Swiss-Prot record:
NCBIfam families: polc, PRK05672.1. It catalyses: DNA(n) + a 2'-deoxyribonucleoside 5'-triphosphate = DNA(n+1) + diphosphate. The keyword DNA repair applies. It comes from the Bacteria. The keyword Nucleotidyltransferase applies. The lineage of its organism: Bacteria, Pseudomonadati, Pseudomonadota, Gammaproteobacteria, Cellvibrionales. Its EC number is 2.7.7.7. PANTHER family: DNA POLYMERASE III SUBUNIT ALPHA, ERROR-PRONE DNA POLYMERASE. DNA polymerase involved in damage-induced mutagenesis and translesion synthesis (TLS). It is not the major replicative DNA polymerase. Its main location: cytoplasm. This is Error-prone DNA polymerase. One of its GO terms (molecular function) is DNA-directed DNA polymerase activity. It is an enzyme of class 2 (transferase).
Amino acid sequence: MAYAHLFTFSNFTFLRGASHPAEMVEQAYRLGYDAIALTDECSLAGAVKAHVMAEECGIKLIVGSYFKLSNNCELIALAPDRAAYAELSGFITLARRRADKGEYTAHMDDLRFRLQTCLIIWLPTANTATEDNARIFSAAFKQRLWLGVGHQLAGGEQRLFQQWQNLAATYQLPMVASHLALMHSAERKPLQDVLTAINHNTSVSQLGTRLQSNGENYLKAIDEVFYLYPPGLIKQTLLIAERCNFSLNELKYQYPQELVPKGLSPIAHLRALVDSGKARRWPGGVPAQAEAILAKELALIEELHYEYYFLTVYDIVAFARQQNILCQGRGSAANSVVCYCLFITEIAPGQINVLFERFISKERDEPPDIDVDFEHQRREDVIQYIYTKYSRQRAALAATVISYRSRSAIRDVGKALGLDPALVDHLAKSLAWWDRTGDLVKRIEAAGVQTERQLVQQFFALVQQIIGFPRHLSQHVGGFVITQDKVSDLVPVENASMPGRTVIQWDKEDLEAMGLLKVDILALGMLTALRKTLAMVNRYEPAIASLADIPPEDPHTYDMLCAADTVGVFQIESRAQMSMLPRLRPRTFYDLVIEIAIVRPGPIQGDMVHPYLRRRDGLEPVSYQSPDIADVLKPTLGVPIFQEQAIRLAMVAAGFSGGEADRLRRAMASWGKNGNLLQFEETFIQGMLNNGYELDFAHRLFEQIKGFGGYGFPESHSASFAILCYASSWLKCHHPAAFYCALLNSQPMGFYSPSQLIQDARRHGIPVLPVDVNHSEAESALEPANSYRTPWAIRLGFTRIKGLDSEAAQRIADNRAQQPYRDIQQLARRSGLSRADLQKLAAADALHSLAGNRHLAHWQAASVEAQAGLFDDEPPPGDALLTAPPSLEKDLTSDYNTTGLSLRVHPMGILRQEYPFSRCKQQRQLSGLSHGRFVQVAGLVTGRQRPGTAKGTLFLTLEDETGNINVVVWKSTQERYRKALLTSKLLIVKGHLERSTPTATTDATPVIHVVAGQLLDYSDRLESLALRSRDFH
């Protein structure tokens, strides 16, 4: 018996389909179907995932889509060939682009004029099975039209079937079996019910007729299909399948080609740009080694026809530089000297051991991947440039699939099952991001619920099933698809939630599977901060205008790093990096490259950190098994740290080709997911034995490579980041006021909150002054400091005030530059402020110079007439109602609630006078305590981290009035104090002090932390304070 299934919703028909596309295809293969059509509603979002599984199984996949038109007619459109696929994709694009995100609008006229070659299955209903509709469909699609019949074993189907037969006979329409499958197996019916309830924002018990009438909407065994449908209707499924011969493999990407001047070939234009760039990079002459690498790269680029790709990225980067937007390529592209000469990347060949095979490989036969970071506050300028240059028909962002995670699954499933909302909320909040779904049992038991109850068991099962289900499409962080022809010829395009952006329906993995080009236009906050720092510094030190003006290898900068004074510094400001810095003690740029890469899961899991540090301290000899291995590992003292080293070792020690070594890299990247790395073990070890290495060493080396897993950090990536790391370090060391000021103006970014940055700035002796209408600019700014320690103070800007209109803030600053404000009434009149603007300024104490205190400012702001015409230049009368100044505690609360920080006393400075905080040590006192001593500390919770390499250990950062306290919480302690650990704003921690012991060869600064034994939540003492921590960053 033969059968092709033609009507399938996967879970990419969001909140209707109850199975993944791959599950649908695999089940069709197991059931012996000849073909299966994936027909998600106005979507091809699941098509690639279905295609990959179909290729693996060897079953025919038909690409199609279901539509409900504006006249309520329903149909399926299937793509028989490449031209029809482009029509279908374009039709989906049209329907999606004319509606809001997540919706679509399609009309019958659209269908007639735009789907000229697709096969159409009309799905009549009781309301649409009319003579008029039959006449319209028949006239429009003629020999490409079928009348679809679904038999779901529901009431009234026999009467409808007779009606459909009459229409089919009248208009000579062949009838075809069109059984709607919402799930690959009947066992998913409860989940499908839950999805329906979520879709309708209600519970399953309240759905009524909106539920599927039974559980028949699944892929049935072929004998069941033959029982349900006449043979003639099943035969038509096969005839349709025979006509549908399109495969997604037919999609071919074409690069944009208008970037090449007339009369030049693409490679000639690229060579000319490279020649110009290398003359600027090496004004004294190009080194012979660089010339050789360039010749090799350009030859391979020409052979693989990647010229247009490089020209496209070059054009985008050139635009950014013309607009003074800081940008820098990173990742594997930093292995390319061509990218260096095009000023896409900044890593010179001599700075690292470039490995072009990591970037482009002939054997790999896939496009290269260039990631470029841009200033996060100006990246939108670059994005809109791309849209303008190529048009929205030829450029769109890649999608990201937003899927259910534990917390969202608990909330939605709980609501759908009608569970107590308070219980559902408690469970969702109590489940940390690292918890497995199985831990939900513990959380429910802790809430006093009997887990053996049937409803609770069903809840567990449904939460497990829905995790990983797609919820909706969002936009990728910056992956652009840019094409020579219309993007919609390849993949449908829809509106993003952000105005001015469009998104394709495929994600990064889909694009990789199809070999389609993606240019990553990424956002990096540190680039914004660096540009703003340089702009401020340049005003008083003209010699420093760009990153290129920063002196290299500055000893004072490295002294600062060795002391772990890195709050705000790019890439090395985390707890783990601060702990490593005094041990590694970087003194050169390459040391920074290693520092950034070594605090990663790969080197840690591969047991590479401690051997490297011992060798660096001279406590362990450095040895190499051969000169070839020495060439690879000498920069890292014989210990493999970088991903490129693993690739090189496979080539020089085990005899792998460049392509084989790259496949090894890919296996390393997916090792944690599927264990593919083990298939290389025998080849690797045998190759090493053939090259004369000992078996024990071969096994040991492979184990180290295996330890990299998916976490081995590329040297090229680390080196790109090290450039920004050094630049931010130098600026913090030599121009700290400008650096901190720029960080405040570049939020949100980085590891630390504005409050923490200000605390650190003040510890460095930099005065920080409050927002004030007679002194502040829109953004925070530098002003001369009356201090012998520093020439500059930071004046906080209006952007720190929550909810203040940015245009109003700019007007205040612009008008004040002409003449200071005398009173609040004049401020309102001259700057055109609303009463709401004034109230926000008063609440933030930004009217202090005009009113004296918050209470007076509130009263005076409230007394200002709203009509601008009634204002005059006279100040308010001197006998205005007197209002007592607020208390320090109230001022502190208002500060945090309006600006997220306070320049007054730290909250701990007030609490310190009370029990039990009076018994707690301050951060600055910890350095004088001995290792192992019992200690109590208290502070605001500013950060929680749980790195994957820490074996379940959680790290807390507490802030008191003297600094940051590092707290280590072992796994056993986490469970006992879980609620306090996850939700508290103010903690007292009781535990033991631990301090690292410097090695015999160094006087490095010891790292101090508290190992928690008890965690006591005192958040109620700060209930009115708007505090937020940066958790698991």
